[in-house]
A protein has these predicted regions:
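Short, cationic low-complexity segments
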Residues: 228-236
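Short amphipathic alpha-helix that is part of the acyltransferase structural core
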Residues: 23-65
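Replication-associated primase and helicase/ATPase modules
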Residues: 1-19
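Conserved beta-strand in the GNAT
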Residues: 73, 80-97, 106
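Short, P/G- and charge-enriched loop/turn segments at secondary-structure junctions
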Residues: 59-61, 198-205
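A short helix-loop-beta-strand connector motif used in the catalytic cores of GNAT acetyltransferases and
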Residues: 63-78
Length: 236
């Protein structure tokens, strides 16, 4: 999933961790200039087009997720005349691409631009809005393939449910990675045998991720009960 990232390396994830684990209500001074305080940011929902642009520009996947139910974003102040300034971070919440026995909503993209903004503040505001909309259990996955460990979720007091085993997440077709959902959309299947029959002159190999760290947050007692039924553990 996509997760906290300007680019997809571990160093950036660590830098993001430094940013978000600082105080979000006051400027957190860093050697390179510090983070923008949450008090100077505006939280908004529904700014999907602008948020999609951020994903295409800054997120390592360069792909907008499917089945999006809500987009939350942070904006700089609009200045003297009020209103919103530029978007500086966005979070996409979707119906999960993997099947769950009960309804949950998944954080499928978390992205920031060049400005150092407190992503924990964005996740927290999104959680409040999702609870208002009736959701009771949030999940997200930090992709080890991209060097992500889930520092934002830890700093946001989410529960850690362990690391999922390596899984087939798509195909490599003539050297280019295609996620499983993209294969289904483009070709009507993600079966390697069927794809090889469809494209006999292409090189097609399965792609496996390195496993994903699972994090979750219950929004009330109903969500806690659902998490227990789903076998989600507390800080495995």
């Amino acid at each position: 999933t996509g997760y906290v990232s300007k680019v997809g390396d571990g160093e950036t994830a660590m830098n993001n961790a430094t940013i978000v684990e600082g105080r979000t209500t006051a400027r957190h001074h860093l050697a390179d200039g510090g983070a923008i305080p949450a008090s100077s940011l505006h939280f908004r929902t529904g700014r999907r087009q602008e948020a999609e642009g951020m994903v295409l520009t800054y997120h390592y996947s360069k792909r907008v997720p499917s089945n999006v139910q809500m987009v939350g974003s942070l904006h700089l102040d609009g200045g003297l005349f009020g209103g919103d300034g530029p978007m500086v971070a966005a979070a996409f919440w979707s119906i999960p691409p993997t099947r769950w026995a009960e309804p949950v909503i998944e954080l499928t993209r978390l992205v920031r631009g060049d400005d150092r903004v407190p992503l924990t503040f964005l996740v927290s505001r999104c959680a409040k809005e999702l609870k208002r909309q009736g959701y009771d259990l949030l999940v997200s996955f930090a992709d080890r393939t991209q060097g992500h460990e889930g520092y934002v979720y830890r700093a946001s007091n989410w529960n850690y449910a362990g690391c999922r085993e390596r899984a087939n997440d798509g195909m490599v077709i003539d050297g280019a990675f295609h996620p499983g959902r993209t294969c289904n959309s483009l070709f009507g299947t993600r079966s390697i045998d069927k794809l090889r029959q469809m494209f006999p002159h292409k090189t097609i190999e399965p792609h496996y991720d390195e496993g994903k760290h699972c994090y979750w947050l219950a929004l009330g007692k109903r969500g806690e009960a659902k998490a227990a039924r789903l076998g989600l553990t507390h800080n495995a």
